[in-house]
Design a protein with these regions (language model features):
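Conserved GNAT acetyl-CoA-binding A-motif
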Residues: 87, 108, 116-126, 149
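Conserved beta-strand-loop-alpha-helix junction that forms the acyl-donor binding cleft
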Residues: 99, 125-134, 151-155
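Conserved acetyl-CoA pyrophosphate-binding loop and the N-cap/start of the following alpha-helix
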Residues: 98, 102-110
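Alpha-helical elements of the RecA-like P-loop NTPase motor core of helicases
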Residues: 13, 135-136
Length: 155
C-alpha cells in the first residue's frame, strides 16, 4: 500500500530540478515548443502555477511512499481550481522501478479520497498521447476523454 505525504521544501526543489526539463522535452516531442525555447517556457509555466513554491495556495504536492518501509516511490500534484469544486492533476510520476505493481492506481485512489475531503466533485488531468501506460491507468480508474488536441505535420 502507498500513502500520500505532503512534500517538503527540499523535495519540492528536487522535483522542480527534474520536472522542468522533463516537461520541456514532452512539449518539444509533442510539437508544441521548439527546443530553443522549451526550457525557458517550462520554467515560466512552473513559476506561474506555483508562485509560492510548495506552499502555493490551493496546490497539493505529495510524495508517494510505501507504507511498509516509508520508501519514496513518486510524487503527485493536484490543484483545487477555485471556485469550482474541481481538482486538476498537474503532475504524477512513479519511479520506473515501481511501475506495474499497482502503486499508481493506489496513489490515484488515495488522491481521490483526499479530493473528496476537500469536497471536490471532479478531477481532471492531461496526458500526452504517447503515454499509453498512463492512459490505460486513467481509463481503468474511470477517467474519460473530454477533449483532444490533434496535430498534422506539414512537409
Amino acid at each position: 500500500m502507498v500513502r500520500l505525504v505532503p512534500m517538503t521544501e527540499t523535495e519540492f526543489e528536487a522535483h522542480l530540478e527534474k520536472s522542468i526539463p522533463e516537461y520541456a522535452a514532452e512539449n518539444v516531442a509533442a510539437g508544441y515548443w521548439s527546443e530553443e525555447e522549451a526550457l525557458e517556457r517550462s520554467r515560466k509555466a512552473f513559476a506561474n502555477l506555483l508562485p509560492q513554491g510548495v506552499k502555493s495556495e490551493n496546490n497539493y504536492l505529495f510524495r508517494i511512499q510505501l507504507e511498509e518501509n516509508g520508501e519514496k516511490i513518486g510524487m503527485i500534484w493536484m490543484k483545487h481550481e477555485v471556485p469550482r469544486p474541481h481538482g486538476f492533476i498537474y503532475d504524477f510520476a512513479l519511479d520506473e522501478t515501481q511501475r506495474g505493481k499497482g502503486y499508481g492506481k493506489q496513489a490515484m485512489l488515495a488522491l481521490e479520497e483526499f479530493a473528496k475531503e476537500l469536497d471536490l466533485k471532479t478531477i481532471g488531468l492531461h496526458v500526452f498521447a504517447n503515454n499509453t501506460a498512463a492512459m490505460k491507468l486513467y481509463k481503468g480508474l474511470g477517467y474519460e476523454v473530454t477533449s483532444q488536441n490533434m496535430t498534422k505535420k506539414l512537409v
